[in-house]
């Protein structure tokens, strides 16, 4: 498969979405064929699943149900949007991918990173990113950012306890150690322009 698949990961409030809105015009202005997308979502079916996953009222959702819904949304998104873009030799910038499931459901929910990884290997047919940027930030800082962002609608995961969000970060740090070949850690607790500059350099090194 051609193209370059780049995923942006991080806990709540790490600045993933903001980063992608900065990266997209930069690469477009460079003449690079590029698309930006997100998980869960990116296409109609997966956006419907996103609505279910984020609905604040669904506090009784069981961990396996949650993991399976994310995997289902991921599969459809991959087949319908990501794979065709890669085949067309495009740069794909994706807000979240498999590592989110490993950190949130595998580690923080206690399903086991290996179990959730195998579930997602089935869903993705081992289609993995060439580069993953992990935006690391303390959960207290990330959640404080969310509280200050009046434009952001609070979702079901935002409402989890601080203990849960600490587990998410712990999970991510374990995943970083496991997949050092493709995951690069970027400090998200710094001005966004610094983050953007650092990430652009990382992506451009892969495009050479």
Curated annotation (Swiss-Prot):
Family: Belongs to the thymidylate kinase family.
The enzyme's E.C. designation: 2.7.4.9
Class of this enzyme: transferase
Reactions catalysed: dTMP + ATP = dTDP + ADP
PANTHER family according to UniProt: THYMIDYLATE KINASE, UMP-CMP KINASE 2, MITOCHONDRIAL
A GO CC term attached to the entry: cytosol
UniProt xrefs under Gene3D superfamilies: P-loop containing nucleotide triphosphate hydrolases
Biological process annotations from GO: dTDP biosynthetic process; dTTP biosynthetic process; dUDP biosynthetic process
Ligand binding (ATP): 10-17
ATP-binding keyword on record: yes
Protein name per its UniProtKB record: Thymidylate kinase
């Amino acid at each position: 498969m051609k193209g370059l698949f780049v995923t942006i990961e991080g806990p709540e409030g790490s600045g993933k979405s903001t980063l992608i809105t900065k990266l997209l015009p930069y690469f477009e202005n460079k003449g690079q064929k590029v698309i930006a997308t997100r998980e869960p979502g990116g296409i109609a079916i997966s956006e419907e699943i996103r609505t279910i996953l984020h609905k604040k009222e669904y506090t009784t959702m069981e961990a396996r149900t949650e993991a399976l819904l994310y995997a289902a949304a991921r599969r459809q998104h991959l087949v319908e949007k990501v794979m065709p873009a890669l085949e067309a030799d495009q740069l794909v910038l994706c807000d979240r991918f498999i590592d989110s499931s490993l950190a949130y459901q595998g580690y923080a929910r206690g399903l086991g990173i290996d179990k959730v990884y195998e579930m997602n290997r089935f869903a993705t047919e081992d289609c993995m990113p060439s580069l993953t940027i992990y935006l690391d930030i303390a959960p207290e800082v990330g959640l404080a950012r969310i509280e200050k962002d009046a434009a952001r609608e609070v979702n079901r995961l935002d409402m989890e306890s601080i203990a849960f969000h600490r587990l998410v970060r712990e999970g991510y740090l374990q995943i970083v150690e496991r997949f050092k070949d493709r995951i690069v850690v970027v400090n998200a607790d710094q001005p966004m322009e610094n983050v953007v500059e650092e990430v652009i350099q990382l992506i451009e090194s892969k495009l050479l």
